[in-house]
A protein has these predicted regions:
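Metal-dependent phosphohydrolase cores
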Residues: 1-181
């Protein structure tokens, strides 16, 4: 997972994390920091690998086997909120901005054209994943929701997503999550 380490060490990636932190310093609700992105990566990987779909995902996306597929999933999770600070500054959709911003980071990390396409499509889709969205984009969207620590949040009752999040969590406990396949 050398390429994942290169993402973590990328100066622009680190700068985006800092800018996200600056913009969210006084935010009461969930933050879009490295820990959140790492959790989304892990949940996304577990969702795909846990269903035995890693080989199928790799083949469908034209990726170099299970290792390549794993790196694509982790890279998408680590980069999915890279453009969040831009949304605060300009109102631009952070998913679409992030898809563009992630490309040079991925190139510097050594990802190939097909891999970059799969990752940037997923990042662009992760906010409003639905019909026509990529499989990985739908997985990221759900993992993004499942990563939120609503149960321990002091302001959860003021959060516009709280009821939805509780529904998603309850459905995940009973194995009836929305279809991401």
């Amino acid at each position: 997972l050398d390429r994942i380490q290169k993402i973590k060490e990328d100066p622009f990636y680190k700068e985006c994390l800092t800018l996200n932190g600056d913009r969210e310093r006084d935010r009461l609700f969930c933050r879009h920091d490295f820990q959140h992105m790492l959790e989304v990566s892990q949940i996304s990987y577990n969702m795909i690998a846990g269903t035995g779909s890693l080989d199928e995902f790799a083949a469908k996306e034209g990726l170099p086997g299970v290792t390549g597929a794993s790196e694509v999933i982790f890279a998408a999770g680590l980069l999915h909120d890279i453009g969040r600070w831009r949304q605060y500054d300009t109102g631009e959709d952070h998913a679409l901005a992030g898809a563009v911003m992630a490309r040079p980071v991925l190139e510097r990390a050594g990802f190939q054209k097909e891999e970059i396409k799969a990752i940037t499509s997923a990042i662009g889709d992760h906010r409003r994943a639905g019909p026509g969205s990529s499989f990985l984009g739908r997985v990221l969207c759900l993992a993004d929701d499942l990563s939120r620590p609503c149960g321990t949040c002091n302001v959860r009752l003021d959060c516009y997503k709280y009821e939805y999040m509780e529904t998603i969590r309850e459905r995940s406990r009973h194995g009836s999550l929305p279809d991401v396949g």
